[in-house]
UniProtKB/Swiss-Prot annotation:
Induction: A possible member of the dormancy regulon. Induced in response to reduced oxygen tension (hypoxia) and low levels of nitric oxide (NO). It is hoped that this regulon will give insight into the latent, or dormant phase of infection. The active site is at H136. It comes from Mycobacterium tuberculosis (strain ATCC 25618 / H37Rv). This is Putative diacyglycerol O-acyltransferase Rv3740c. SUPFAM superfamilies: CoA-dependent acyltransferases. Was identified as a high-confidence drug target. One of its GO terms (biological process) is response to nitric oxide. It catalyses: an acyl-CoA + a 1,2-diacyl-sn-glycerol = a triacyl-sn-glycerol + CoA; di-(9Z)-octadecenoylglycerol + (9Z)-octadecenoyl-CoA = 1,2,3-tri-(9Z-octadecenoyl)-glycerol + CoA; hexadecan-1-ol + hexadecanoyl-CoA = hexadecanyl hexadecanoate + CoA.
Length: 448
């Protein structure tokens, strides 16, 4: 087991579940009978060939961190890991998200491989859902979403049902992209070998370009210690609406997404009499790949974006966000790989402090919220003939970072998954209505 995987396992507690998940929503095929979901679930249980990743469980000697390792289960109880649930009446999306929130709050059983899949029926409109989760020691959020898409096909009538745990879904090796904390851990090891001059250059890049720096974020109700219970919210927006704002304003799609989130967070905090005078700061993962990079390589960094929540005008906020992201990405893309790595380390290393008990209260937040836009499928996807109409990432929250917003694309929509600490972030579902309001304000601001 790698030191980073061991860190995820050792840092987990009842208050800090460290798994990532996704809620996928499906529309049964035309003519599907009342038993379609049950039959689909039974067919999933017949997929008894299980990939090695789904057989791994942690083991330790006398509880010592340095002796943590992986064991391989020869006999995986699929009836335990793959479960079927039914929603109570009236079967609204509200009931679905309440169940998802409870499932996302529960720790995975360390005596078994660290994953679960829940097939959920009972939605009154006939749709069904699949909620899946895996421990962050096995996958990060991006590779987890990729893995959960593996059973999908672009052909609605393809006959053979596949599952995420089936070896057949592993024909393309999943290159694990580092998540926020895994990326930090990897950078800690890599940057140790950098020459001092490289670090000085990276530090100069931050100061001379006047980039957004850690610890410049205001302390808010989102930056407190968290409990173990989670509240999940999810909603989709037409991709065309966001693209129309992008084209009219001459900015990137991610700039518009960040502006949507900025407006929503501004209203949410204002509703709670907690809007600070200084702007919120978001941690935003970005791709640093250039045309010169090989296909197999990864170049992923992170920047801190000024969300301009102190500005009343949505157009001004969008312009400020565009300028902040452009400046940050330009500096990182022009640096050699080692220096870009060092800059990302300087930006993210303070976040590691908040993983230690009590320090979330004692230190200013390095940033206020993580907002991640994960590339998704460009074509409609199907599972056993059922079209996937929503794919909502469910990430993790940490002490000092009580809210997470992650989104991905599904064909012609953007699917937002919002996860908050149930105790620290009340009525997290209101963030969704504020996102819609924020998008409408942006549309008006650019003349749409």
């Amino acid at each position: 087991m790698s030191p980073i995987d061991a860190l995820f396992l050792s840092a987990e507690s009842r208050e800090h579940p460290l798994h990532v998940g996704a809620l996928q929503l499906f529309e049964p095929p035309a003519g599907a009978g009342r038993g379609f979901v049950r039959e689909t679930y039974q067919a999933m249980l017949q997929c008894r060939e299980i990939a090695p990743l789904f057989r791994k469980r942690p083991t330790s000697l006398h509880g010592a961190l340095i002796n943590l390792g992986w064991s391989t289960d020869a006999d995986v109880d699929l009836g335990y890991h793959a479960r079927r649930s039914a929603l109570p009446a009236p079967g609204r999306v509200r009931e679905l998200l309440e169940l998802t929130s409870r499932l996302h709050s529960n720790l995975l059983d360390r005596h078994r491989p660290l994953w679960e899949t829940h097939v959920i029926e009972g939605l009154r409109d006939g749709r069904f859902a699949i909620y899946s989760k895996m421990h962050h020691a096995l996958v990060d959020g991006v590779s987890g979403l990729t893995l959960m898409r593996q059973p999908m096909t672009t052909d609605p009538i393809e006959g053979k049902l596949r599952t995420a745990w089936s070896p057949a879904t592993q024909h393309t090796a999943i290159k694990r992209r580092r998540g926020r904390l895994q990326q930090l851990g990897g950078m800690l090891g890599s940057v140790a070998g950098l020459a001092p001059s490289t670090l000085r250059l990276a530090r100069s890049a931050l100061i001379e370009q006047q980039l957004t720096l850690p610890f410049g974020a205001p302390h808010t109700m989102l930056n407190v210690a968290v409990g173990g219970a989670r509240r999940c919210a999810a909603q989709s927006w037409p991709l065309d609406r966001v693209k129309a704002v992008k084209d009219a304003a001459g900015v990137s799609l991610n700039d518009v997404v960040l502006a949507m989130c900025a407006g929503a967070l501004r209203e949410y905090l204002d509703d709670n009499d907690a809007l600070p005078d200084t702007p919120l700061v978001a941690m935003v993962p970005v791709s640093l790949r250039t045309d010169r990079d090989s296909v197999g390589g990864n170049m992923v960094g992170a920047v801190l974006c000024n969300l301009a929540t102190h500005l009343d005008d949505p157009a001004d906020r969008l312009n400020a966000i565009h300028a902040s992201m452009r400046g940050n990405k330009n500096v990182l893309s022009q640096l050699p790989r080692a220096q870009a790595l060092a800059v990302s380390l300087l930006l993210l290393s303070p976040a590691a402090l908040n993983t230690l008990p009590g320090l979330a209260k004692a230190t200013p937040p390095p940033f206020n919220v993580c907002i991640s836009n994960v590339p998704g499928a460009r074509e409609p996807l199907y599972f056993n003939g059922a079209r996937m109409v929503g794919n909502y990432p469910m990430s993790l929250v940490l002490d000092g970072q009580a809210l997470n917003i992650t989104l991905t694309s599904t064909a012609d929509s953007l699917d937002f998954g919002v996860v908050g600490c149930r105790r620290s972030v009340p009525h997290v579902q209101r963030v969704l209505s504020h996102l819609e309001t924020s998008l409408k304000e942006l549309e008006r601001a650019v003349g749409l």
